[in-house]
Swiss-Prot record:
SUPFAM superfamilies: Stathmin
Protein name: Stathmin-4
Phosphoserine modified-residue sites: 90
Record gene name: STMN4
S-palmitoyl cysteine-type lipidated residues: 20, 22
């Protein structure tokens, strides 16, 4: 990157000093950055894990590419060394784990049996309720049918009695007409 490009970039980004201060190795010993019109201090911001490359410069602005280098593990202790080594479980620990697993299995089995018993009881209650409702329906249907049959019987008997009464009245009327006719015939003779 050229000095002119870096200088123009510093004018565009006033927060670059804050950005650079995050990567400084020893920020307390560095003096604060003072911007001067024609000079840029390239040593002020030392960034070891980053590289800035100018890609394009035109009248509308500039473009840069920031390449982050992979972190180095120099001076970092090994990860595996800090972990305590697993010891082999003793026979007693294995036995305790097996007993705990057996207890869990028995508990789960008991819970399952309890759940199934509750479900079976609920099904039994539902069936009993359905049987009671069916019996009540049958009883009500029989009562309604008996009432209907009784009503039909009473209506039929009343209808027959009315017909019989009308027939008797007709017979009576016919008898009266016959008697009147006979009386007229006897009177005319």
């Amino acid at each position: 990157m050229t000095l002119a490009a870096y200088k123009e970039k510093m004018k565009e980004l006033p927060l670059v000093s804050l950005f650079c201060s995050c990567f400084l190795a020893d920020p307390l010993n560095k003096s604060s950055y003072k911007y001067e019109a024609d000079t840029v201090d390239l040593n002020w911001c030392v960034i070891s894990d980053m590289e800035v490359i100018e890609l394009n410069k035109c009248t509308s602005g500039q473009s840069f590419e920031v390449i982050l280098k992979p972190p180095s593990f120099d001076g970092v202790p090994e990860f595996n060394a800090s972990l305590p080594r697993r010891r082999d479980p003793s026979l007693e620990e294995i036995q305790k784990k097996l007993e705990a697993a057996e207890e869990r299995r028995k508990y789960q089995e008991a819970e399952l049996l309890k759940h199934l018993a509750e479900k079976r009881e609920h099904e039994r209650e539902v069936i009993q309720k359905a049987i009671e409702e069916n019996n009540n329906f049958i009883k009500m249907a029989k009562e309604k049918l008996a009432q209907k049959m009784e009503s039909n019987k009473e209506n039929r008997e009343a209808h027959l009695a009315a017909m019989l009464e009308r027939l008797q009245e007709k017979d009576k009327h016919a008898e009266e007409v016959r008697k009147n006719k006979e009386l007229k015939e006897e009177a005319s003779r």
